[in-house]
């Protein structure tokens, strides 16, 4: 059967039709977007300009911050523009591009979080072999695998959606183009496609989440034999990552591990992994991390001293 696509334009319904609420949301999301850029750039500069870049934990954190910036930038700018626009429209081509990029960078983020959990597992459960196992070559390989996994995931979502005909209503009950809200507009039987989407998005999120949980079960089992001081240090290192994982995975699992259907709450849950998690990640990873705080002080104190020397 040939694809018959009469929809060349989609209308994004967003959060509200009330103009006052939209202006308030614009100010809020503008603040969030600026905070995301400032926080994640601060993390990246502090890591790359110090010796922390040579430690696997911070090597992955650097790439997590980069993926956060890319991921939120596929959604937030368009969302802010729509909040001030009279008609919240997006062309079919741009919708497909947004679908691909959000799942590409979202997939990368999921796999990097899994890689970071593996790094913590090796550091705590196999400390004597840590430097050998987590070599720079191994870290680079993990990042390449994360990017490849993200591409395969997003390409699958893209291919499953691009051949679906859209010839009926063109209103997407969301603030960006995602698979489930789009499939709701399809004018053909999408039962099999829905199962494939669940197998792709749902299972990836579920399997990686289970792997993350298992890694921390092994970590908790291992640190039982540690002294109180070592146990406290190990838990402090892992707690930041656990908070980020829950913040990102819990809403993603709620949305993607169910049959093809949408709820009005999906838009709120999607905010957690598209805007809230990228905004809080820098704060979560630096709040209880002495090394990260010291690196920031070192970088920015050097910058202040350089500026003073230039003035005098």
UniProtKB/Swiss-Prot annotation:
Alphabetically ordered keywords of this record: Cell membrane, Disulfide bond, G-protein coupled receptor, Glycoprotein, Membrane, Olfaction, Receptor, Sensory transduction, Transducer, Transmembrane, Transmembrane helix
Pfam families, alphabetized: 7tm_4
Annotated Gene Ontology cellular component terms: plasma membrane
InterPro entries: GPCR_Rhodpsn, GPCR_Rhodpsn_7TM, Olfact_rcpt, Olfactory_Receptors
Side of membrane Extracellular, spans: 1-23, 78-98, 157-193, 257-267
Glycan attachment points: 5-6
Membrane topology: Multi-pass membrane protein
UniProt subcellular location: Cell membrane
Cysteines paired by S-S bonds: 95-187
All ranges on the Cytoplasmic side of the membrane: 48-55, 119-137, 218-233, 288-312
Gene Ontology MF annotations: G protein-coupled receptor activity; olfactory receptor activity
Function: Odorant receptor.
Stated family: Belongs to the G-protein coupled receptor 1 family.
Stored PANTHER family: OLFACTORY RECEPTOR
Protein name: Olfactory receptor 4P4
Organism: Homo sapiens
